[in-house]
Amino acid sequence: MKLITNKQGLVGNITVPGDKSMSHRSIMFGAIAEGKTVIRHFLRADDCLGTIKAFKALGVKIEETDEEIIVHGTGFDGLKQADGPLDIGNSGTTIRLMMGILAGRDFDTVILGDESIAKRPMNRVMLPLQEMGAKMHGKDGSEFAPITILGKQSLKRVEYHMPVASAQVKSAIIFAALQADGETIIHEKEKTRDHTEHMIRQFGGEIEMDGLTIRVKGGQKFIGQEMTVPGDVSSAAFFIVAGLIMPNSEIELTHVGLNPTRTGIFDVVEQMGGSLVVKDSSRSTGKLAGTVVVKSSELKGTEIGGDIIPRLIDEIPVIALLATQAEGTTIIKDAAELKVKETNRIDAVATELNKMGADITPTEDGLIIRGKTPLHAANVTSYGDHRIGMMLQIAALLVEDGDVELDRAEAVSVSYPTFFEDIRSLLK
């Protein structure tokens, strides 16, 4: 696909799609709650539609209208054995959280996905669930999908110290803990996104959060809710960076989720001297949301590492692009988790942006980016990774000497089906 290039400014207003993490979880909680859950501003992208498909296969009645998703939940015990394997496509969130949900059911399930899912590590989820009494295994006894979950297991409480900072692993343990005897205690390595914890409370459940320690009791019942999903800050990030690096630009992003566990990119933009203002913030069904305004800015390099990394892990590809347009060196470290995303994002970012003229050195746990560098025409690939694909389109906007051809552009639909349309709507 030929990308949009050689543009002199982006001006206008965008409402980014619903938050991907929250859209997944809204379906999951709606399914295990009792009664009707109505979800507005749901992300109708491949990953989240895959979660709907999976729960329909498990016997949950889900209606889809133009404005709403309506889930008719009948509790954990209302889930039924699927007729065949659950195919969750490209969604790591779906497979890992479903492992926790299905660990305590009284039927067997096989979960599989695409070629990317088949390469992603699942021991990080299987090991704590097995400690709780779950029985599951990967293909040929490995840790890789397809994952077979054996039903009719009694789950027991566990006190678990997480070896990696992962909201997906934490959430899988929480879903299993809701079906276990007693109180499960989870100690996080670093604070990660806490949508699952907040949604437990939103759906009428109880959970204790004290710093990095989480306590959750089994046997809880949930009640269906009405909710509006805020805009996804990870999707907004592409327009935040575009507005900062494109000359003569000012972009307003409305109804963006402002959960502090997700807004690390705001802190980085401030460190780099970028113009970013948050206004009109309000609580949307328990979640903070607001309008984010960005303008063209002169940027300087910075160092990014430590406990901020889980707050911006999905934004690092586009933050790396931002750093190519900053004066000086930017160092990103403590981000080895990027190697086990949809692709090895450390290598993918360095390889593809360097093709375009950037000066980036990949490291074991991050990137060293030397700026400021002009970007040039090139043939690039997304590797089938939606965030790499969208980052490369933002990079292409700066190119003045020819075309940028993106291979596997269709990956963008995983999280942002209208991305290219929204870019065009901002062109002067």
Curated annotation (Swiss-Prot):
This protein is called what?
3-phosphoshikimate 1-carboxyvinyltransferase
What organism is the protein native to? Listeria welshimeri serovar 6b (strain ATCC 35897 / DSM 20650 / CCUG 15529 / CIP 8149 / NCTC 11857 / SLCC 5334 / V8)
The residues listed in the UniProt record as binding 3-phosphoshikimate, with positions renumbered to this chain, are: 20-21, 25, 166, 168, 314, 341
Enzymatic reactions: 3-phosphoshikimate + phosphoenolpyruvate = 5-O-(1-carboxyvinyl)-3-phosphoshikimate + phosphate
* Gene name of the encoded protein: aroA
Oligomeric and partner information: Monomer.
- Lineage of the organism: Bacteria, Bacillati, Bacillota, Bacilli, Bacillales
Briefly, what is this protein's role? Catalyzes the transfer of the enolpyruvyl moiety of phosphoenolpyruvate (PEP) to the 5-hydroxyl of shikimate-3-phosphate (S3P) to produce enolpyruvyl shikimate-3-phosphate and inorganic phosphate.
Lineage, top-rank taxon, reads Bacteria
A matching Pfam family: EPSP_synthase
